[in-house]
Swiss-Prot record:
Protein encoded by which gene: mbtG
Source organism phylogeny: Bacteria, Bacillati, Actinomycetota, Actinomycetes, Mycobacteriales
Cofactor(s) this protein cannot do without: FAD
Name listed for the protein in its UniProt record: L-lysine N6-monooxygenase MbtG
One Gene Ontology biological process: biosynthetic process
Superkingdom, natural source: Bacteria
UniProt source species: Mycolicibacterium paratuberculosis (strain ATCC BAA-968 / K-10)
Top-rank EC class of the record's enzyme: oxidoreductase
Length: 428
C-alpha cells in the first residue's frame, strides 16, 4: 500500500482523507493518507493558527464543503454512489449531527465563523479516522523514490507529497518592533480583546488577508487607516454566477490563454476585497489607499517609516511615509516551503522545472493532477495550481474536485478522472 503525506491538516488534507476513506470503504485501493501538522486539524481557522481570531465569518459558502461540487469521476459506474457517500461528511450532515441544522436554516443560512468551520473540519477528520502526525516539518528530503518528512521527533516516508497551507503567520518586516505587527501578532491581540489605539495605522496588502484585518480594525480606536498595495485601487472581487462558476467548474479553464487566466485571477481572486468588506470601507471615512510596494521599513522616533516604490510610466518613484503602527498583512510567501527542501530534493525539483526554483516556474508546471510535471516522486501543490488548472483549487471552492485530481493520479490510467462527467449526476 502506497502512502500520500500531506504537509498541513487543513481543509485540503481533510477533503483528500475523506475521499480516500470513502473509496476504501467501496473496495477501491487508495493510498494511506498521513497529515503532518505542527498545531492541530484546521488550526489556521482558529486563533492558535495565527491567521484569524476565529470569530470572523467564512468568506466562502459553507456548502462548498469537503465534497463539493459532488461530481466525482473516479470510479466508473459508481461515481453517483461515491458522491452519495461523500454527502455523509457534508456541511449539512455536520449540522444535523450537532443538532443545529434547523437553527442554521431559520437564521438564513449565515456564513459560519472561522472557529465553527474548524469544528466542522475536525468533525470530518474524526469520522473518517484521519491519520495526523503531530510535529513541525524541519526538512523535506528524497530517499530513493520516496519523500521523507523529517520532524524533530520522527520521520514520515511517503510515495507522494502534497503541500498545503499559507505557511506561518509570524513573518514581519521588523521582527521585535512593537509598532510593527505580524499577522499572527495582530490576531493574537484581537483574540485577547486587546484594543489597538493609534493615530495613523497602515495595513500592508490588498488581498483577503489584509481585508479581514481591516474588518477587525474598524472596531478599534484608530484615527486613520492606510491600505498599502501595488494596485491602482482597492478592487472588489467578482462574486456573480459567472465568476463563481470558474471556481466550481474549471472545465473550460485550460482553453483560456495564460493572459486571459491571469486577468480572470486578478478580477476574482488575487489582491481583491470581497464585496462585504468593500461595503464596510465605503461607510468608514478613516480608510485610505496608498499605491506602492514597500521596499524598506525602519523604526524612527516612535514611528515606523515605510519606503514605497511606485512605477509611474517609465519612472520609478520612491516616497517615505510615517505611521504609528504598521500591520504586515501582505500575505504568505507562495514559496514558504522552499527552505524545507534538502539540497537533493531541490536539485530534483529544479531538474524537472528546467531552471531555478521560482513561483512562476512552479505555477506554470502544475499538471492536471495538481502535481509538478516531470518530477518523481510526485509533489502536489494545489495552492499554486490556480493559473494552469483553475482558480478554485488553491482555496475552498472545489475541495471535492481537488481530492479527485490528487487521488485520481494514484488509481491508474483506467480510473483517471475525466474532464467532465456526462453520464451521472448526483442530486443533493
Amino acid at each position: 500500500m502506497s502512502t500520500l503525506a500531506i504537509l498541513g491538516a487543513g481543509a485540503k488534507a481533510v477533503a483528500v482523507a475523506a475521499k480516500a476513506s470513502v473509496l476504501r470503504d467501496m473496495g477501491v485501493e487508495v493510498p494511506d493518507v498521513v497529515a503532518v501538522e505542527r498545531i492541530g486539524v484546521a488550526a489556521n481557522w482558529q486563533a492558535s493558527g495565527g491567521w484569524t481570531d476565529g470569530a470572523h465569518r467564512l468568506g466562502t459558502s459553507p456548502e462548498k464543503d469537503v465534497g463539493f461540487p459532488y461530481r466525482s469521476a473516479l470510479v466508473p459506474r459508481r461515481n453517483a454512489e461515491l458522491d452519495e457517500r461523500m454527502t455523509r461528511y457534508s456541511w449539512q450532515s455536520y449540522l444535523i449531527a450537532t443538532a443545529s441544522f434547523a437553527e442554521w436554516i431559520d437564521r438564513g443560512r449565515p456564513a459560519p465563523t472561522h472557529r465553527r468551520w474548524s469544528q466542522y473540519l475536525s468533525w470530518v477528520a474524526d469520522h473518517v479516522g484521519m491519520t495526523v502526525v503531530h510535529g513541525e516539518v524541519e526538512q523535506l528530503a528524497v530517499t530513493g523514490d520516496r519523500w521523507a518528512l523529517h520532524t524533530h521527533e520522527t520521520t514520515v516516508h511517503a510515495d507522494a507529497l502534497m503541500i498545503t497551507g499559507p505557511g506561518q503567520a509570524e513573518k514581519s518586516l521588523l521582527p521585535g518592533n512593537p509598532r510593527m505587527l505580524s499577522i499572527a501578532q495582530f490576531w493574537d491581540r484581537a483574540a485577547n480583546h486587546d484594543r489597538i489605539s493609534a493615530e495613523r495605522v497602515a495595513v500592508i496588502g490588498g488581498g483577503e488577508t489584509a481585508a479581514a484585518m481591516l474588518n477587525e480594525l474598524f472596531r478599534h480606536r484608530v484615527s486613520s487607516i492606510t491600505v498599502i498595495s501595488p494596485q491602482a485601487t482597492l478592487f472588489t472581487r467578482g462574486e456573480g454566477y459567472f465568476e463563481n462558476s470558474l471556481f466550481s467548474d474549471p472545465t473550460n479553464w485550460p482553453a483560456l490563454t495564460l493572459a486571459e487566466r491571469r486577468d480572470a485571477l486578478a478580477r476574482t481572486d488575487r489582491g481583491v476585497f470581497s464585496s462585504s468588506v468593500q461595503e464596510a470601507l465605503l461607510a468608514d471615512d478613516r480608510i485610505h489607499h496608498l499605491r506602492g510596494r514597500v521596499t524598506h521599513a525602519v523604526g524612527v522616533q516612535g514611528q515606523i517609516r515605510l519606503t514605497l516604490s511606485t512605477n509611474r510610466g517609465s519612472e520609478n518613484l520612491e516616497t517615505v511615509h510615517g505611521f504609528d503602527l504598521v500591520i504586515d498583512g501582505s500575505g504568505a510567501d507562495s514559496l514558504w516551503f522552499a527552505p524545507l527542501f534538502s539540497q537533493e530534493a531541490l536539485d530534483l525539483l529544479e531538474l524537472g522545472l528546467g531552471g531555478p526554483l521560482s513561483s512562476e516556474r512552479l505555477q506554470e508546471a502544475i499538471g492536471y493532477d495538481l502535481a509538478v510535471t516531470d518530477v518523481t516522486p510526485k509533489l502536489f501543490l494545489p495552492n499554486l495550481s490556480g493559473l494552469t488548472q483553475g482558480p478554485g483549487f488553491p482555496n475552498l471552492s472545489c475541495l471535492g474536485l481537488l481530492s479527485d485530481r490528487v487521488l485520481g493520479s494514484t488509481l491508474g490510467p483506467t480510473n483517471y478522472p475525466a474532464r467532465r462527467r456526462h453520464d451521472e449526476r448526483q442530486p443533493l
